[in-house]
Regions:
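Walker A (P-loop) phosphate-binding loop of P-loop NTPases
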Residues: 18
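Conserved lysine of the Walker
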Residues: 21
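Post-Walker A helix-loop "phosphate-sensing" segment adjacent to the P-loop in P-loop NTPases
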Residues: 30-40
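Conserved nucleotide-sensing/catalytic segment adjacent to the nucleotide-binding pocket
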Residues: 40-42, 49-98, 114
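Conserved NTP phosphate-binding and transfer environment spanning the P-loop NTPase/kinase superfamily
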Residues: 125-273
C-alpha cells in the first residue's frame, strides 16, 4: 500500500543470502497487480560479469559477493533506457556456463509500470547513483527468528539462513553441505561489507522468518548434513547444526502452502524460480 501511495519508478529489494528475496519479490508482484500497478521484476543476478571476468578475493578465490562482480555500466545503461521509455533486450545469467546470455526477453515500461529490482546489492546507492531517491522505494528482507531454545540460549539469526542455503544448494545447485559450509566465511564477509552497511537505506524492513520453519527444514537438512565426512573441517559445523535440529519435531511438508516463502528452499512452490 505504501508503494501504491508513493508510486515510485523503482522498488529495490535487498537482504543477506537466503533471506527469501526472490519469493518476496514474486509475492509483492501479485500485491502490486491488485493495487493497479504493473510490476516488472528483474534480478540483479542476471547482470553478473562472465565468470572469467569475476574478481578474486585476497585468497585468490572467485568473489561473487562483491559489487564489482556485477557489470555495473551495462546495468545502469539498461535501467536508464527503461526509465527513458526505451525497449531493452534483457540478459539472463547462465550459472552453468558462467556467462550472460540473451534469449529474446524484451522489456519496455508502460505508464503504470514499476521496476522491481531484487538482489544482494539493491540498496547500495552506487548501483544507480543518478536516479533521484524520491523515485525509489527500498525494502530490506532478512530472516530474524523470534524463538529461543530456552531463556538463556538464543538462536543466531544466521542459523536459519544457513539451513535454508544448505537445503536449497543441495536440491537446486548441486552443492553438498560440505561445500555450502565451506563457502560460509566468504558469504559472511560479503554480507558484512556489501549488505549490512546499507540496510538503513531501506524504507521498510521485512522479517521473512517463519516460526515453524526449523521443524520443516529438519526433515530436509538432516540427511544432507549427515553426508559431511567426519575427517573434514566442515564436520564441526555440520554436527552442531544436526544437534540443534534435534530440538524440533518435524512437520509434514503437505502442511506448507505452495505460496509460502519456505517453498523457495524446500521445493514445491507455485512460483517459478
Amino acid at each position: 500500500d505504501a508503494i501504491a501511495e508513493k508510486r515510485p519508478k523503482i522498488v529495490f529489494i535487498s537482504g543477506p543470502s537466503s533471506s527469501g528475496k526472490t519469493t518476496f519479490s514474486k509475492r509483492l508482484q501479485i500485491q502490486l497487480l491488485v493495487d493497479g500497478i504493473k510490476p516488472e521484476v528483474l534480478s540483479m543476478d542476471d547482470y553478473f560479469v562472465n565468470r572469467v571476468d569475476t574478481p578474486r578475493d585476497e585468497n585468490g578465490q572467485l568473489d561473487f559477493e562483491t559489487v564489482n562482480a556485477m557489470d555495473l555500466p551495462f546495468f545502469r545503461q539498461q535501467m536508464h533506457d527503461l526509465l527513458d521509455g526505451k525497449e531493452v533486450d534483457l540478459p539472463t545469467y547462465d550459472f552453468g556456463k558462467g556467462e550472460r546470455v540473451f534469449e529474446g526477453r524484451k522489456l519496455k515500461l508502460q505508464k503504470d509500470s514499476v521496476l522491481v529490482i531484487e538482489g544482494l546489492h539493491a540498496l547500495n546507492p552506487i548501483i544507480l547513483p543518478d536516479v533521484e531517491r524520491s523515485l525509489t522505494f527500498k525494502i530490506y528482507v532478512s530472516a530474524l527468528t523470534t524463538i529461543n531454545i530456552d531463556n538463556h540460549n538464543w538462536i543466531p539469526t544466521t542459523d536459519i539462513r544457513l539451513l535454508r542455503r544448505v537445503v536449497r544448494d543441495y536440491k537446486y545447485r548441486g552443492y553438498s553441505a560440505k561445500e555450502t559450509i565451506a563457502r560460509c566465511p566468504s558469504v559472511v564477509r560479503g554480507e558484512q561489507k556489501w549488505v549490512y552497511p546499507f540496510q538503513e537505506e531501506a524504507d521498510v524492513m521485512f522479517n521473512s522468518a517463519l516460526i515453524f520453519e526449523f521443524a520443516v527444514l529438519k526433515r530436509h537438512a538432516e540427511p544432507i548434513l549427515s553426508e559431511v565426512p567426519k575427517f573434514c573441517e566442515e564436520y564441526t559445523e555440520a554436527h552442531r547444526l544436526l544437534k540443534f535440529l534435534q530440538y524440533f519435531i518435524p512437520i509434514p511438508e503437505k502442511e506448507i502452502p505452495p505460496t509460502s516463502l519456505l517453498r523457495e528452499f524446500v521445493g514445491g512452490s507455485s512460483f517459478h524460480y
